[in-house]
A protein has these predicted regions:
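Class I SAM-dependent methyltransferase SAM/SAH-binding core
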Residues: 86-94, 98-156
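C-terminal lobe and adjacent flexible extensions of AdoMet/dcAdoMet transferase-like proteins
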Residues: 238, 244-249, 255-377
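Short, glycine-/aromatic-enriched active-site segment of Class I SAM-dependent methyltransferases
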Residues: 202-222
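A short glycine-rich, Lys/Arg-flanked "PGG" loop and its adjoining helix->strand segment in the class I
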Residues: 180-195
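A short acidic, Gly/Pro-enriched loop at the edge of an enzyme's catalytic core
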Residues: 155-166
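A short SAM/SAH-binding and catalytic strip from SAM-dependent methyltransferases
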Residues: 165-178
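Conserved alpha-helix/loop element of class I SAM-dependent methyltransferases that forms part
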Residues: 51-90, 104, 108
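N-terminal auxiliary segments of SAM/dcSAM-dependent transferases
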Residues: 2-54, 311, 322, 328-359, ...
């Protein structure tokens, strides 16, 4: 089989023994320096890639006011990683930085849940740890801890396999030198039916090799970004058979110098959800199944947005593919739906499944769900 230049290197640590390992470590050192010393706040960023421009939902705004300002000002995320129905969950945040998302999620999981943050940058973790006791007083409970480590080496941390309900990450996976190892580690830690819900940066094509070694473009979350279709391939190879796009927005490279370097490359911030369910197929198949949302998820009494192509109205029986049926049936959302049908019959490919660029190219608000029944992907 003929190898495709650029595909493997963007997904996994490059082969080559000691030299490749040294190169990966050099990249990690540059990332540590960029986020530990070069940047002192989100105002120092030179693009919109690692700074979320999307509106925070009204229900979450009061929770952000309970997070310390020194934590908030060191936030470099590119999306929102707070999915529905989090009460009592055990959550892992990859590349947690100074801890904004950890402290936000800590309030959502409540005293009966736990949030663990992992980061390799000592300066960022120092900020997170400094205010851990302060946040426990604010919330009335202590349910947070932080670990120093690399997200490619999750097996080296004191984390029990199959012990997490949810893994999140916010504009960090693109900075990894071995994205395949990250996904493998996540799958190992998720319980059956658990979910990886993460926002990251993607490109409309493979980033040229010279740009992938540019320290500023890498630190700004651009040159480490995967071509979107390579990400889908990598996710499927890692056991996440059907990645679901939740929302996306185009990114603006407004710095003239960086814009000149990136040229025609188009970058997007996108949020995906990936479920750890063995029975998922590699395509959306039609088994004549349907679901009806009960309207019982807090904050979603009228409808529940599941991904970019699924918005479930309360009480409406909605035809779905076998994968969507399983994602709802085998996950924490099962109690909020009524399920119709099974897998005893097959009617072919579910209508609307395609393979074109999934992101919305026009600038503006983050792209939300399409009309119900418009297909799965």
């Amino acid at each position: 089989m003929t190898a495709v230049p650029g595909m493997a290197e963007q997904g996994a640590g490059a082969p080559g023994g000691g030299a490749a390992a040294a190169g990966d470590e050099a990249i990690r050192d540059r990332v540590r320096t960029y986020y530990g010393a070069t940047l002192s706040s989100s105002a120092d960023l030179r693009t919109s890639a690692c700074c979320d421009a999307t509106a925070v939902p009204a229900a979450l705004r009061p929770l952000l006011t309970r997070i310390h300002p020194q934590v908030l000002e060191r936030y470099y995320g590119c999306g929102l990683v707070a999915p529905e129905q989090l009460q009592g969950l055990r959550v892992l945040d990859l590349g947690c930085g100074a801890g904004r998302d950890v402290y936000l999620l800590a309030q959502l999981v409540g005293a009966g849940g736990e949030v663990v943050g992992v980061d390799m940058t000592e300066a960022q973790l120092a900020v997170a740890e400094t205010w851990r006791g302060w946040h426990a007083e604010q919330f009335g409970f202590a349910n947070v801890r932080f670990l120093r480590g690399e997200i490619e080496q999750l097996h080296a941390l004191d984390l029990e396999p199959g012990s997490f309900d949810l893994v999140v990450s916010n504009c960090v996976v693109n900075l990894s030198t071995d994205k395949a190892a990250v996904l493998a580690g996540v799958r190992r830690l998720l319980r059956p039916g658990g979910e990886l819900y993460f926002s990251d940066v993607y490109c409309d094509r493979r980033v040229p090799e010279p740009l992938r070694h540019d320290p500023v473009l890498y630190g700004e979350c651009l040159s480490g970004a995967l071509y979107w279709n390579d990400f889908l391939r990598l996710a499927r190879r890692s056991g996440f058979a059907d990645p679901r796009l939740v929302s996306d927005r185009p990114l603006a490279v407004t710095d003239p110098e960086l814009a000149a370097r990136t040229g025609a490359l188009r970058f997007f911030s996108a949020t995906y959800r990936l479920f750890n369910i063995e029975a998922l197929e590699d395509a959306c198949e039609d088994h004549g199944q349907a679901v009806a949302y009960r309207g019982t998820v807090p904050g979603a009494a009228e409808a529940l947005v599941f991904d970019k192509h699924h918005c479930f109205d309360t009480g409406r029986i909605t035809p779905v593919c076998g994968n969507t049926w399983l994602m709802l049936r085998e996950s924490r959302l099962a109690g909020h739906f009524d399920f119709h049908g099974d897998f005893s019959r097959h009617f072919g490919l579910f209508p609307g499944c395609g393979g074109s660029l999934p992101f919305s190219p026009a600038a503006g608000p983050a792209a939300g769900p399409a009309a119900a029944g418009s297909g799965c992907c």
